[in-house]
Amino acid sequence: MMQLRYSPTSPYVRKVSVMTIETGLSSQIDRVLTNPWDPQTDLGATNPLGKVPALITPDGAEIFDSRVICEHLDAMHDSEPFFPLEPKTRSIALRLQALADGILDAAILRLIEERRRPGEYCWPVWCDRQATTMNRSLDWLEERRSLLDSRLTIGSIAVGCMLGYLDFRYADEDWREGRDGLASWYSAFAQRPSMRDTVPVE
């Protein structure tokens, strides 16, 4: 059995969880609930970065981060690969994943700054910069929504998990406004069983 260190609210964990479902590997993974913010956590022994997700293989190898874990899982099933082999399709999938993960990075940095720091230490300019990054990147996705029309890849999985996280943590900011194409795509994508089964919860 593989072991997955996870947090139920992490969008990066969700990406891995969706992959395990889509690849049919869920039964081969033992999930271990982990709070990376707990000062007593032993997560650092598995991932020296102290982050989830982290995967431990049956032979004891530690695999991180989510991108590497997903590619590792993709090599373990016999269906069509989620990391495409054809160069152009692969480039699109990897770019979509990079953009989705970058939006998440900005969203989480902003979340920590705005909601975790004491108000007197919050840096508004930093938060505005992250918000600009998020919105500019979402606009890029809207303008190139057709990139999501191909078969299921790591790119579409990453984008779907990212948009789900924005609904989860930024429900008061409507990312759908002015992005009808992206909103329509996500409305359908969110109905996949792998997405319904991995909705984040506190």
PLM feature segments, named:
Residues 184-198:
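Charged phosphate-binding loop/patch that engages nucleotide di/tri-phosphates or the phosphate backbone
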Residues 112, 199-202:
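Short coil/turn segments at secondary-structure boundaries
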Residues 70, 74, 94-97, 138, ...:
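Non-transmembrane alpha-helical segments in soluble domains
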Residues 100-187:
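GST-like fold's C-terminal all-alpha helical module
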Residues 26, 79-80, 174-176, 196:
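Short coil/loop linkers at secondary-structure junctions
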Residues 68, 181, 194:
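Residue-level recognition of oxygen-bearing side chains
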Residues 1-124:
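GST-like domain detector, emphasizing the conserved glutathione-binding G-site
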